Amino acid sequence: AGRYRMVDFVLSSMANCGISNVSIVVRKNYHSLMDHLGTGREWDMARRHGGLNIVPPFAEKGVRIYSGRVEALGSILSFLEHQKEKYVVMSDANIAVNYDFNALLAAHQASGADVTVAYQKTEIPEGRKNDNYTLTIDADGRVTELLFNDYRSGVQNLDLNIYVLERETLIKLVKDATARGLIYFERDILAHNVNILNIHALEYTGYVAHVCDMKSYFDENLKLIDDRNLEALFPKGSPIYTKIRDDNPTRYVTGSKVVDSILADGCVIEGTVENCVLFRGVKVKKGAVVKNCVLMQDTVVEPNVELDCVVTDKNVKITAGKKLSGTE
């Protein structure tokens, strides 16, 4: 926390499992992401063969931004057809998870499934009430039903949007779906073919942070102040990598006060910080009071500012004497 972007978690999980040929299909507002990822060196993916491949929208069709995973995959069909790997793993980047893709692949191979999906037994997060898939699973682990925007309360089998399948199978499914004008991988391919395809599910019992909107981003950041959550997401032996930035250690000026907070390198604290997550290079000036906030990289909080339940973008300056307050 305080250093990482959402893409770091899935990308690091792949790197930790020995996956070194990764294609990231971006949709919009991706320039900052490309700057963050660079050549992929921090994830050991700056390679002559394979490595990190970033595919912008309009790569082939030049018509509109992708509406669903099928259109996104259709844009990299040529890339998929020229690869040599037998299997493909797919994941969205809107979850913070330290995932073992090798365990998913092993389960897939053992079951003989066409597609294997990772799921979590949990109540549907508030931010995903209108964007979720849940699974009905039989005693053998086979998916018998896939529901879209499940409205039921209580614990459900929530699809994590992490899949593994053979590359040739994926190519065939995408080509067939594209020919029929279909858009969504889960709704149009998996759900409609649940009785034809052999779809198996593997439960994930580790820590998952679902980031769907600003509220969930705020909540999930502050949850990491709890050491139990932090240790669950960042276990020893399975590191999360990110872009390197050479900063000095955080400096606490005499008279400053910091309570129950996570601060990245390069911060300078002269005021009061309570129950906050501060990214790299944040400066809190004398007399400023910052509570229950997530302040991104290089935010400057000037003297006598009061912040409560605020999320800032990077390079934001809050001028002296201002009072900003949100709600939890």
Question: How would you label these PLM feature ranges?
Answer:
Residues 1-222:
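Unchanged
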Residues 168, 176-328:
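Left-handed beta-helix
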